[in-house]
A protein has these predicted regions:
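Pyridoxal 5′-phosphate
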Residues: 2-212
Length: 212
């Protein structure tokens, strides 16, 4: 980690807005080989596009079709028996993902499970952590959070008998800017902290790519 931090610091100190410098960084990129693992959209002339929308929808891995076809083939041949006898049995499928997921979140394999959809998981989380009362009932969220996140939050607010328009606080960027300033987030928390029951900010905003 320290080596990577030192390298990033060196890059920031020697940064140049030139094609040569960008090419040099590409050659030094230890992850560059993974580029070949994905399909990259092309323009009308067949040139690969520069894709900067991974925070919204990632590129398709080249192995995806083969993986999906394997499951469809097992379904066709095995039917319900696929739950136990497919190449990747469906019943314990989540166990195949726990180890890699644990590395991403920094937990133990026994502590991590892949389940449901994002929206369902948000509802499960808010059932536990959103406990509004008369004084403290507001939810703080990004103004441009993923639409289904907003739907889930509004649903929970209504479920507890409150009006979303009065209860949901949306963080917006300043006029002419694309990301929310940290100091603006802190200011809202200072001003509304006694009224806020839940703060829900995504790790990476799907629309702007801002990291929180």
């Amino acid at each position: 980690m320290q080596l990577q931090a030192d390298r990033l610091f060196s890059i920031s100190m020697n940064y140049k807005k030139t094609a040569e410098f960008a090419s040099q960084l590409d050659k030094q990129d230890q992850l560059s080989s993974y580029r070949d693992e994905f399909f990259i959209p092309k323009d009308e002339n067949g040139n690969e596009l520069i894709y900067l929308c991974g925070n919204s929808l990632g590129l398709q891995p080249k192995r995806t079709k083969a993986y999906l076809n394997q499951e469809l083939e097992d379904w066709a041949k095995l039917g319900v028996e696929g739950h136990e006898h497919a190449k990747n049995p469906w019943m314990p499928y989540h166990e195949f993902l726990s180890e890699s997921y644990s590395k991403i979140v920094g937990g133990k394999k026994s502590e991590v499970v892949a389940m449901n959809s994002l929206t369902v998981n948000l509802h499960l989380m808010m059932v536990s952590f959103y406990r509004p009362n008369i004084k403290r009932n507001k939810i703080l969220i990004e103004a441009d959070a993923f639409p289904s996140d907003i739907y889930a939050v509004n649903s929970q607010i209504s479920h507890h008998g409150y009006e979303p328009k009065d209860t949901l606080i949306k963080l917006s960027s300043r006029e002419g800017e694309s990301v929310v300033r940290t100091e603006d987030i802190e200011q809202v928390i200072r001003e509304k902290g006694d009224e806020i029951a839940l703060i829900m900010l995504g790790g990476v905003n799907y629309y702007t790519g801002q990291v929180f």
